[in-house]
A protein has these predicted regions:
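N-terminal helical hairpins
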Residues: 1-3, 19
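N-terminal core-binding DNA-recognition domain of tyrosine recombinases/integrases
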Residues: 11-25, 31-118
């Protein structure tokens, strides 16, 4: 496992997406989403130290749910930030930066379901 901070992981994840051909506008909006993640968890915190209860607190936090002026963020914006956070964490696990994925099963995945969906048992 490669040790890294939340900030280092966010930067490396954005770099990975850039190399994968994501558009600069997408990278810009994802970086803004990850700024919210860094503000909550702390940029210098070790990514591997993040646990499920802390993620739950993040999902309920004013940093995620409200704008700086106190107004509520649009549900679509909150969902996207959560999705980008999950994408980064899944990438971090797949790239050896963390061993366990500290995310609830109900976290939205967005358009690209990652390998986890193949790990689930089919019903029936």
């Amino acid at each position: 496992m490669t040790e890294c901070t939340v900030h280092q992981a966010a930067e490396a994840f954005i770099g990975h997406l850039r190399e994968s051909g994501k558009k600069e506008r997408t990278l810009y909006t994802y970086r803004k989403d990850l700024d919210v993640v860094e503000a909550f968890f702390g940029a210098d915190r070790q990514l591997a130290e993040i646990r499920l209860p802390q993620v739950g607190k993040f999902y309920k936090s004013d940093l995620l749910l409200k704008l700086p002026d106190g107004k509520e963020r649009a549900e679509r914006t909150v969902t996207k930030t959560v999705r980008v956070f999950r994408m980064m964490m899944v990438w971090a696990r797949e790239s050896g930066r963390i061993e366990e994925l500290p995310l609830p099963k109900s976290t939205p995945m967005g358009h690209s379901r990652v390998k986890e969906s193949s790990d689930e048992q089919p019903n029936g």
